[in-house]
Amino acid sequence: MKKSSRIIAFLLLVVLLFAGMAATYKSVIKNVNLGLDLQGGFEVLYQVDPLNKGDKIDKKALQSTAQTLENRVNVLGVSEPKIQVEEPNRIRVQLAGVTDQNEARKSLSSQANLTIRDAEDKVKLSGSDIKQGSAKQEFKQETNQPTVTFKVKDKNKFKKVTEEISKKRDNVMVVWLDFKKGDSYKKEAQKKNPKFISAASVDQPINSDSVEISGGFKGQEGVKKAKQIAELLNAGSLPVDLKEIYSNSVGAQFGQDALDKTVFASFIGVALIYLFMLGFYRLPGLVAIIALTTYIYLTLVAFNFISGVLTLPGLAALVLGVGMAVDANIIMYERIKDELRIGRTIKQAFSKANKSSFLTIFDSNLTTVIAAAVLFFFGESSVKGFATMLLLGILMIFVTAVFLSRFLLSLLVSSNIFKNQFWLFGVKKNKRHDINEGVDVHDLKTSFEKWNFVKLAKPLIGVSILIVVVGLVILYIFKLNLGIDFSSGTRVDFQSKQAITQQKVEQVVKDSGLKADQIQINGKDNKVATVQFKDDLTRAQDNKLSDNIKSKFGDTPQINTVSPIIGQELAKNAMLALIYASIGIIIYVSLRFEWRMGLSSVLALLHDVFIIVAIFSLFRIEVDLTFIAAVLTIVGYSINDTIVTFDRVRENLQKVKVITTTEQIDDIVNRSIRQTMTRSINTVLTVIVVVVAILFFGAPTIFNFTLALFIGLISGVFSSIFIAVPLWGIMKKRQLKKSPKHKLVVYKEKKSNDEKILV
């Protein structure tokens, strides 16, 4: 292929890529299934209990109940509802974009168990006697009053029932919906608004399969009630008792505002990454921008393909993935720069870097996969969305940042147009050696030669131990400020166009017949408020408070309620997630490198986790489920940085082959850190830029999540440089002292020329 044809191929491919994305991006964005926190709606987790004593809740009963709930949801007209059966006796319902949340929740939890009883409250007919789908809301011809009509399966049975009632002294046929133990017709008949729907006198047997319920419906509200009863009867009754043990509702405006802010923050973060890559890496940086844009597009396409639900943490994961994709590019570009500095041509440097960087990228991303997989397995809906996006992002990193980026760069490199333009790859001519000098990439001088990381690590490890001890004391004294996800209770978030005052919020809570345990006013110009209750509010209390807030402040609030049972489970799952992620990482690193590297990596990770926990404890920052997602992300991301350094340690061990002195170990540690320092700084800078943008411009609801990421990223860079690798060096020195003849053979070359690291 001629020089010009490669450039033409590059330009044509880029034009096709961007033309394809430009033509379809609107439909891709339109088809993104937004979660509750981005478009409003609600999520309820029901505990399914037997309605009658002695009944059992088995798999069949759960599936039947889920089907009935789905029928009711279809009546509400909600697009793409999610109804999931969860073992052993739970059903999760997610309705995004539902307009009347109160009505929807009432419709879902109602048993819709219609019974026809006599005046002594004895059951004569039940919902099982009604023909499926026969219920209608109609109007009486004479009075135009709303009614509900339905047909019975057996008209002879209905005739027999009406005949029996007609012969009684108190000859009324009472229609009940969801009759409860203790309910009584005679008591309710004395009230202005009785619980039963209607009570009609029966003077003679009715020889018909049609039943009409009337008298209990008046005006427009009566029409609405009659229509709802008809729809519930057609959807089917629930032969079980549903108890809400977790609920989360978000107002549409609240969700839209969160989406707008986070998208804006993400745009700023990604734009700054693009500028950095172009300024620091120049021509390869331009290729990286093309690959990163494709990465965002393809990740969203894949997310739509698997029908993923995009939540706020999921959106953050998408942007965080951009930082991780940048890392894959930076690893390769730094390798290219090293190869250019020892005197190789651009084409040779590209070829060599292409081979040497792949395994490093693979290893570093696989550890993040472990953390994301654990998050997906143990997390609830919003955390699952985060984990799903993270897993897809890592897959797309290999598609775009590895394969697409390399292919595009190979077209430019092989064209030879940039043959001697080393500055376009970020390397000055006076920094290049002659290839005949025989300089190895591992012998190149860096900007950090004056830094003795082994010497610096000793006092810094001491400082870290001191921080851990102080952190333990802080944790013991202050404890963690657990959010309702773990402590149970109810949290209400809302915003207003006007400044909110403590007194106004207190009054609204008081008017709702409640007493708040904590009220916080925050946000720009005090326009955001958070109200917390230690008790989990009932649905009726939720509804009343929501209506009062909307009336006073003009915003439908986000209400999150967690029962003590769920709070305990979430806390348990959070601990298990952290333990399993750590075990998975230590096993993988031990297999790919050595157990000392795995152990020192996990100790560094635990240090990062503890730093985040200690800071959150000291400053009384609330810990919720997204905090756990942030911690596990740091676990996966911090190990990413550590593995890149350990990969360079492995290369340096390969060069040394045999270790006989502790000075050699110190030298390997120092050189490995120095050689990967630029990559570490550049990578963390690109990710921190995104995190800081979301921290300052993103939605308030993910502020704590983003803050935990920010603290973890800073701590992660510190621990990978001053804890993980130096700790490995300390353990390696002990191994050397205990070894026979005071000698360690760390590398042997097989006859097949395959590498073999002995550690």
What residues fall within each predicted segment?
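A structural signal for conserved, well-ordered secondary-structure elements
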Residues: 1-759
